[in-house]
């Protein structure tokens, strides 16, 4: 991964064989990012995304491998109990035009991933919500 910071905006290149969530965490810790939005696109050959069942309060994961274009990767970097936390969703399409997506659990870059991180002044922590079973923004 390489990146360049321009004020509160960080332009990131995640390289072949690097795992996206690991690189986002490394960047956030290195740059002391407590709150930010994330947008990206690129290519992956292995990824896992989940879909949350609200009734069961459980994620169901789907893993894909092959040639995929990341058509959208979006979400937030923030904190939970004062520690790094990220919530990203990703959609990726294959050579048949099929697109798969959900809550990002893991994605390995096959060529490149181009990311823009918009750092916000402030902190928004998360806390577990027993009603939804999710870690929600705490204001």
Language model feature labels by segment:
Residues 1-86, 91-139:
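N-terminal intrinsically disordered, cationic/polar leader segments
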